[in-house]
Amino acid sequence: MSQEYLDFELPIAELEAKIESLRAVSGDDNEINLDDEIKRLQKKSEELTKKTFANLDAWQISRMARHPNRPYTLDYIQHIFTEFEELAGDRAFADDKAIVGGLARLDGRPVMVIGHQKGRTTKEKVLRNFGMPAPEGYRKALRLMEMAERFKLPIITFIDTPGAYPGVGAEERGQAEAIARNLREMSTLSVPVICTVIGEGGSGGALAIGVGDKVNMLQYSTYSVISPEGCASILWKSAEKASTAAEVMGLTAERLKELDLIDNIVTEPLGGAHRNYAETAQNLKARLLTDLEDLDVLDKDDLLDRRYQRLMSYGYC
């Protein structure tokens, strides 16, 4: 997969292009040794990357959360879990490809894993509906959660959606009801539920698989009731105010952690999760194992009581 850079990363991209050019020259001519120059540029690129990513604003983080090379749910399943067996369909209407889920093992332990799935190519994006589930996607997710509860399996969800699909067909088939039912049922599941925002956490479409005992966010993910562009269009009648909206919305992992709306922030590699899938997955796996260990000691009543208290603590009074 070719590396793509956002506009604020362009100075880094220029350095990386120079490094690749020197490597090509050095490889084509064995008499030319450019190792020292390559190392110098690599060090300069690393320092520039550290400086750039130490000062990202909310709008830049919003764009990182949507980076086209960012790992999606199936990428994390491949790197974190073993023996994944995908389960399909809501047993009522259709199989929504914007939601994937199934049985898997986490360090040998059986779990149910569910998540939003986006596409990379045009064909994949259409197949996955750009990561925007219809009601049947959320009903599929609920079916898998109820199955996990019957077999006493922990549930792990990965959130990455701009929002639930707002099409006429989705509304006719009960989009709001499907989301509301998931919120209600997830709050009463008798097994541990761990939710992680891996990219975009957009509105009710994210919440529909986001009610859990632990809620984590990757370092450069976002979680909000609306996109910065949508917020700007409503408040200032112009999407060009998206950067201002992003700042006031408090959608970053750091801000949400300050508000106690999430439990943990999972560190990403320098430059973002798309720079190193394996390292990101390793960090996330460690977080999931720690969370499961914390929740395993709770009996059903304690688990449900703690989840209830967590939900009741949200907001200001």
From Swiss-Prot:
Residues 40-294 form the CoA carboxyltransferase C-terminal domain. GO terms for molecular function: acetyl-CoA carboxylase activity; ATP binding; carboxyl- or carbamoyltransferase activity. The keyword Electron transport does not apply. It catalyses: N(6)-carboxybiotinyl-L-lysyl-[protein] + acetyl-CoA = N(6)-biotinyl-L-lysyl-[protein] + malonyl-CoA. It holds the Pfam family ACCA. Pathway: Lipid metabolism; malonyl-CoA biosynthesis; malonyl-CoA from acetyl-CoA: step 1/1. GO terms for cellular component: acetyl-CoA carboxylase complex. It is an enzyme of class 2 (transferase). Its EC number is 2.1.3.15. It comes from the Bacteria. Belongs to the AccA family. Component of the acetyl coenzyme A carboxylase (ACC) complex. First, biotin carboxylase catalyzes the carboxylation of biotin on its carrier protein (BCCP) and then the CO(2) group is transferred by the carboxyltransferase to acetyl-CoA to form malonyl-CoA. Acetyl-CoA carboxylase is a heterohexamer composed of biotin carboxyl carrier protein (AccB), biotin carboxylase (AccC) and two subunits each of ACCase subunit alpha (AccA) and ACCase subunit beta (AccD). PANTHER family: ACETYL-COENZYME A CARBOXYLASE CARBOXYL TRANSFERASE SUBUNIT ALPHA, ACETYL-COENZYME A CARBOXYLASE CARBOXYL TRANSFERASE SUBUNIT ALPHA, CHLOROPLASTIC. This is Acetyl-coenzyme A carboxylase carboxyl transferase subunit alpha. It comes from Actinobacillus succinogenes (strain ATCC 55618 / DSM 22257 / CCUG 43843 / 130Z). The gene is accA.
